Swiss-Prot record:
Domain tr-type G: start-end pairs: 326-495
Region: Disordered, residue numbers: 1-239
SUPFAM superfamilies named in the record: Initiation factor IF2/eIF5b, domain 3, P-loop containing nucleoside triphosphate hydrolases, Translation proteins
Residue stretches of biased makeup (Basic and acidic residues): 1-19, 35-45, 70-98, 113-122
Location(s) in or outside the cell: Cytoplasm
Biased segments, Low complexity type: 158-169
Biased composition (Basic residues): 181-191, 211-220
Lineage: superkingdom: Bacteria
Function in brief: One of the essential components for the initiation of protein synthesis. Protects formylmethionyl-tRNA from spontaneous hydrolysis and promotes its binding to the 30S ribosomal subunits. Also involved in the hydrolysis of GTP during the formation of the 70S ribosomal complex.
Protein name (database record): Translation initiation factor IF-2
Source species: Lactobacillus delbrueckii subsp. bulgaricus (strain ATCC BAA-365 / Lb-18)
Keyword Signal appears in the UniProt entry: no
Length: 825
């Protein structure tokens, strides 16, 4: 055999001549090297057989004896190498098993030791196989000696301060192979070993799992009390429980150890539909307790629904508070109608409110704050007409000082006497202002003599009442009046605690189309803030917005400050008390309870027919009645009209107020009036377009008024059968304001489009904003382009001005009307 053939044969058998020639030492074998060597050898064998077969098939005819001998020698060498490799593999496996058994006997944790190298006889370059595998780190002799000594020692208990590592070394010793040639792990056949990265990770996870098992076993063996957590539904029901009116399903679920959904379901089975957040009354809670078979006891506490009692307690606590500060005085201007109350207030505020009021009289309470010489004064302007007696009474109750206006040329009148009585019953001081001193017929001495009959004696006559002669029109005596107001306030030592919860009184209330229920409130103690949960009379809510008397939104309102608030669930009554509660839940419960009490009182006031009152009932039913559906712009006006109608005394006829409310006249009002054959009276409000057409179809009479005594006179005349009008108001056109211009010496010019009908220069005109009449007057001028015209018909633009009114805005509706004669018959 030539040298070249020998080299080729050596390469085919996987032998490296450079590594094996001249060496007669020990051959280090690892499991991975053996396995790779076997695979490579097997591959070499198959390749050699394939080449041999191909060679024999292709060149069988040309085969020479030398080639046959060479092939025979190669096969013999292959068989010899296979036998030798099998013996070496078996020896390595046996050695590894011995080391494993020895490590398990010496220590509790498996320690993988390095398998000693297997001696291999020296081979020639042609005989040594080529084995490739991972490089095996050879430990130092000192390390081997230490490992051997540790394996012979008995296993020591791990110290409590430092636990031994449970991770085995993955590179110190090869893993053995099973009969199928696959590596096994921890004695489990068919699993991969720990030489690859994946095997090392799985080994680490296995060790961590063993650590967790040992830790759990240790905790289980230790005497430890395990915390038991029981669910709410598994806990037994109490024998009895204490409840409060207003609790919801969630609150009851916590007490009864039941889920809120179960409470809702049980009440549903009992015929009561609720949700988890709805407040429950006493009967519902007791019914639920009876169904569970337990006793329910109502918690005894102070009646928080008694707003008047809470209001009185808060007022008393504020007097003894250490946080009291000086507050502005609340001054109410009272007197007879048309004696100059609003004119005086206009002089103080530098405004012209009285010019915009229908008939020149005030018909609701207005609250304003005026700063005079760095001092704030809150003024309340009350109506002077006889119909507004309740408004004057409310003004006297919430005021500190009453300024009584008496006209010098008119003297004491009925409403003047009524104002004196209201002030005396409220126990507030009175300052008399004798107005209209600029008129020729002014006689202040006569007025003084008249007032002395009602125990109002001036200081110069030895009394204690302050008298001031003024002229609201010219400004005479105004400074002296203000000085006396401030002096009287200082003597009263008016103080309040701004840190306590706010309390106040409703001055006026109404329903706004864009804002909803609106209440004008005077804060008397504490500070009201946006977001506070409040109860106002029978209504409740959370303060959404607050607006001061100048129309600016504010975040808080201090004592003696009038504000307009929104956020209530309904329109409150005038003179209702406002109280702030800790949370909205309590406020809701109190408001609902008060509404229920009010409804119960209304039911109790219904007079049922009995044998005792049968005759009176028959007599009353035989009387003729004027049924009225009453709608007004504010709550106070509706209340005043209803009281005035009830006071009309006509024999054989009575007034029956079917419904009273605030806001524009709508379809529901027309339907109610049609069903009951009633008359609709609107005070400073207008019907909607749908309501107007429905009323025309159903023949419902709608009467609109802006002055209260005209409404009272018409109702009285109708009751007496004397209402035979010779003139009737007829709407002749409707306009929409598209633009406005302000021109000096002229005022505000409205550019309007005539939607239907027509408008003339002599027609009356009403300004309607959001369904409420803002002004009723006459057309001052009417133009098309630059020409004055007498009439503008539908479909054309025009420019017009209104007498004594400049507060015209884009989007306002204008209603043109004429008074036409009605022919009898």
């Amino acid at each position: 055999m030539t040298k070249k053939q020998e080299n080729e044969t050596s390469k085919e058998l996987g032998m490296d001549n450079k590594k094996t020639s001249g060496k007669s030492g020990k051959l280090k074998i690892s499991v991975s090297a053996i396995r790779k060597g076997e695979k490579k050898t097997e591959g070499k064998r198959s390749n050699a057989r394939r080449r041999a077969n191909n060679h024999s098939n292709d060149h069988s005819k040309r085969r020479r004896p030398a080639a046959q001998d060479l092939l025979k020698d190669l096969k013999q060498k292959q068989r010899a190498d296979e036998a030798r490799l099998d013996q070496e593999s078996k020896a390595a496996k046996q050695e590894y098993k011995k080391s494993l058994n020895k490590a398990e006997a010496s220590e509790s944790k498996p320690v993988v030791k390095k398998v000693e190298s297997v001696e291999k006889p020296a081979e020639t370059a042609a005989e040594a196989p080529k084995v490739r595998g991972p490089k095996i780190l050879k430990p130092s002799p000192a390390r081997l000696k230490q490992n051997q000594a540790n394996s012979e020692k008995p296993a020591a208990k791990p110290s409590s301060s430092r636990r031994p590592s449970s991770r085995p070394s993955f590179t110190e010793a090869p893993m053995p192979e099973n009969k199928e040639g696959r590596r096994r792990k921890s004695g489990k056949p068919g699993r991969k070993g720990q030489n690859s990265y994946a095997d090392q990770g799985r080994g680490a996870n296995s060790n961590r799992s063993e650590q967790r098992k040992r830790k759990n076993k240790k905790h289980q063996s230790a005497p430890q009390v395990k915390k038991q957590v029981t669910q709410r539904k598994d806990r037994p029901l109490p024998e009895s429980f204490e409840y409060e009116v207003g609790m919801n399903a969630q609150d009851l679920g916590k007490i009864l150890h039941r889920e809120p959904a179960e409470i809702v379901k049980k009440l549903f089975m009992l015929g009561i539909m609720i949700n988890q957040n709805r407040s429950l009354d006493k009967d519902t809670i007791e019914l639920l307790a009876a169904d569970y078979g337990i006793e329910a006891v109502e918690k005894v506490h102070e009646d928080i629904s008694d707003i008047d009692n809470i209001f009185a307690q808060e007022m008393e606590e504020s007097k003894n508070s250490e946080n009291q500060v000086v507050r502005p005085p609340v001054v109410t201007i009272m007197g007879h109608v048309d004696h100059g109350k609003t004119t005086l207030l206009d002089r103080l505020r530098h405004t012209r409110v009285s010019e915009h009021e229908a008939g020149g009289i005030t018909q609701n309470i207005g609250a304003y704050q005026v700063r005079i010489n760095d001092r704030l004064i809150t003024f309340l302007d009350t109506p002077g007409h006889a119909a507004f007696s309740s408004m004057r009474a409310r003004g006297a109750e919430i005021t500190d000082i009453v300024v009584l206006i008496v006209a010098a040329d008119d003297g004491v009148m009925p409403q003047t006497i009524e104002a004196i009585d209201h002030a005396k019953s409220a126990g507030v001081p009175i300052i008399v202002a004798i107005n209209k001193m600029d008129r020729p017929g002014a006689n202040p001495a006569h007025v003084t003599e008249q007032l002395m009959q009602y125990e109002l004696i001036p200081e110069n006559y030895g009394g204690s009442t302050i008298f001031v002669n003024i002229s609201a029109k010219t400004g005479m005596g105004i400074d002296e009046l203000l000085e006396n107001i401030i002096l009287e306030a200082d003597m009263l030592e008016l103080k309040a605690d701004p840190k306590q919860k706010a309390i106040g009184t409703v001055v006026e209330a109404r329903l706004s189309r864009g804002k909803g229920p609106v209440a004008d409130v005077l804060i008397q103690q504490g500070t009201l803030r946006v977001g506070d949960p409040i109860v106002v009379g029978d209504t409740f809510g959370r303060v959404r917005t607050m607006t001061n008397d100048k129309g600016h939104q504010v975040k808080k309102a201090t004592p003696s400050m009038p504000v307009e608030i929104t956020g209530l669930n309904d329109v409150p009554e005038s003179a209702d008390k406002l109280v702030v509660f800790a949370d909205e839940k309590t406020a809701r419960a109190v408001g609902e309870a008060r509404a229920q009490q009010s409804l119960q009182k209304q039911r109790e006031n219904v007079q049922h027919v009995t044998l005792d009152n049968l005759f009176d009932t028959m007599k009353r039913e035989s009387m003729k009645s004027v049924d009225i559906v009453l709608k007004a712009d504010v709550q106070g006006s509706a209340e005043a009209l209803a009281q005035s109608f009830q006071k009309i005394d006509v024999e054989g006829v009575r007034v029956n107020i079917i419904h009273s409310g605030v806001g524009a006249i709508n379809e529901s009002d027309v339907t109610l009036a049609s069903a009951s054959n009633a008359l609709i009276i609107g005070f400073n409000v207008r019907p909607t377009a749908t309501a107007k057409s429905q009323a025309a179809q159903e023949g419902v009479d709608i009467r609109l008024y802006s002055i209260i005594y005209k409404a009272i006179d018409d109702v009285k005349a109708a009751m007496q059968g004397m209402l035979e009008p010779t003139y009737e108001e007829k709407v002749i056109g409707n306009l929409t304001v598209r633009e406005t211009w302000k021109v000096s010496k002229i005022g505000t010019i409205a550019g309007a489009f005539v939607d239907n009908g027509y408008v003339t220069r002599e027609s009356g005109i009403r300004v309607i904003r959001d369904g409420v009449v803002k002004y009723d007057g006459k057309v001052a001028s009417l133009r098309r382009f630059k020409d004055d015209v007498k009439e503008v018909k539908a479909g054309f633009d025009c420019g017009l001005t209104i007498e004594n009114f400049n507060d015209i805005k884009e989007g306002d509706e204008l209603e043109a009307y004429e008074m036409q004669e009605v022919k009898p018959g």
